[in-house]
Regions:
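Mixed-charge, Lys/Arg-rich low-complexity intrinsically disordered regions
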Residues: 1-13
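Basic/aromatic-rich interaction segments and small domains that mediate binding to polyanionic partners
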Residues: 28-55
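Intrinsically disordered, low-complexity, charged/polar segments
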Residues: 48-79
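Short coil-to-beta-strand transition motifs
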Residues: 18-24
Length: 79
């Protein structure tokens, strides 16, 4: 039996930590200039990306962040 993946009606908060699979992403800022909600994310290993269409979803693994597509993905050393 498959479980439906459903979008949650909850905002992504700056400073919030959200999981996706085995990774965790920190929301560092909301981005302007996109048709869909976009946020800048930082993963624990230093990888950063801009996630467009980002939202929280109920999945088989629990609540996860997902997005439509990403831009500007890169590793950024901590300062």
């Amino acid at each position: 039996m498959t479980q439906e993946i459903r979008r949650r009606n909850e905002p992504l908060l700056v400073g919030g930590m959200y999981g996706q699979g085995t990774s965790h992403y920190l929301v560092t800022e909301h981005l302007d200039g996109f048709l869909f909600p976009a946020v800048h994310l930082r993963r624990q290993d230093g990888y950063e990306l801009d996630a467009v269409g980002a939202a929280l979803y109920d999945t088989q693994r629990g609540v996860e962040i997902q997005w439509d597509y990403s831009l500007h993905g890169r590793f950024v050393p901590e300062t």
